[in-house]
Amino acid sequence: MRRSFYSWLMTQRNPKSNEPVAILADYAFDESDFPKQSDNFDEVSRFLEESASFAFSMSDFDAIWEDYLGH
């Protein structure tokens, strides 16, 4: 079974970075309702679009998801 997107994303945290993946990781870390156990693109994407308390570029998310799938 693939590790959750959130678990992988937390390995990308870097508060000093301006890279989109590091920014999303910091946002997700602070978001209590982030789907932490999910490895499903639709579930995470829907959360970001509809429920997140922050705004994030979905095109950046798509690229980050591709990186996640590659690991």
Curated annotation (Swiss-Prot):
Highest taxon in the source lineage: Bacteria
Disulfide bond residue pairs: none
Pfam families xrefs: YozE_SAM_like
NCBIfam families in the record: PRK13672.1
Family recorded in the similarity comment: Belongs to the UPF0346 family.
Entry protein name: UPF0346 protein SSU05_1322
Lineage: Bacteria, Bacillati, Bacillota, Bacilli, Lactobacillales
